[in-house]
């Protein structure tokens, strides 16, 4: 007779969870930030709001975003005028779009990740799907399983309505799944489409306007597993530890509410200030066990909520400008894609490191940190270890 302890030991992996492949996807429709204010005020029939348009232009100029991708085209918006109003009942139209498009965009990214991984998709044991764009039953996890033709016995986890910190959450969850189930291969997908949040401008709700200037669509997928098969699977980053916390005195700092008018966002407090004031505590808790206290000795992947957050974090921690290069690059090329952002940044970092001939996937460094920030105010902190290139 075997003991429970023996069974338990046999069920667990030996090494740490590792990212084995990354894939990303965006809708085809690309919008230049410099042209967006004119387009946005025209399509929402708001051109008479000249002062507000000037304010929006300034927001777009300061956003550090060059371009974004959006499922919503001019044609779609003309067919759905309620999406262009500030507060018109429009949830049905929004939902009809996202319940189809979110899994579809997720499939695009997942297909790329599976191809890079190079293993048969029948070896995928778990699916973790995350989106803040719409809800449905069965969920986007089920739709993705069907679209990809995964085994019906694949173990699924669906995360809805988490917001911008959730790129860290999916890594934390996938780490536990991979390390506690020997041989597990977890397909992680974050897919975000702004069709739930797009709306016309309003003079009194400027935080909504901030969202219109920042948010973009995108999907990212990872394959995560422990104990990579030598010569077959190629690890890119190891997941060493993961933590989540709610920042003190931050109630209502970022809120999202799903209502008849779609998903509305409210930024009620000094979000960049709250994050920069508390970030060192999270770093100390994560890196003290490793004996690391020089934040410039790490490679950095931070959710780019907006340029002000990055500027204040950089200033507070005295980070060298190049530390947030990959983060700023993704913000500039794609905008804020909510949960998918940090996964795009992981992809950008390992790509650039290979291109520049650096010795590791983490800008030549050994240890790194990934931060997710979002509603709560919630912070996810993931400690990463790079892999030699």
From Swiss-Prot:
GO terms for molecular function: naringenin-chalcone synthase activity. It comes from the Eukaryota. Pathway: Secondary metabolite biosynthesis; flavonoid biosynthesis. It is an enzyme of class 2 (transferase). It is found in: Cytoplasm. GO terms for biological process: flavonoid biosynthetic process; polyketide biosynthetic process. It catalyses: (E)-4-coumaroyl-CoA + 3 malonyl-CoA + 3 H(+) = 2',4,4',6'-tetrahydroxychalcone + 3 CO2 + 4 CoA. One of its GO terms (cellular component) is cytoplasm. The active site is at residue 164. InterPro entries: Chalcone/stilbene_synt_C, Chalcone/stilbene_synt_N, Chalcone/stilbene_synthase_AS, Polyketide_synthase_type-III, Thiolase-like. CDD domains: CHS_like. It holds the Pfam family Chal_sti_synt_N. SUPFAM superfamilies: Thiolase-like. Its main location: cytoplasm. Keywords: Acyltransferase, Cytoplasm, Flavonoid biosynthesis, Transferase. Its EC number is 2.3.1.74. Involved in the biosynthesis of prenylated phenolics natural products which contribute to the bitter taste of beer and display broad biological activities. Chalcone synthase that can use 4-coumaroyl-CoA to produce 4,2',4',6'-tetrahydroxychalcone (also termed naringenin-chalcone or chalcone) which can, under specific conditions, spontaneously isomerize into naringenin. Belongs to the thiolase-like superfamily. Chalcone/stilbene synthases family. This is Chalcone synthase H2. The lineage of its organism: Eukaryota, Viridiplantae, Streptophyta, Embryophyta, Tracheophyta.
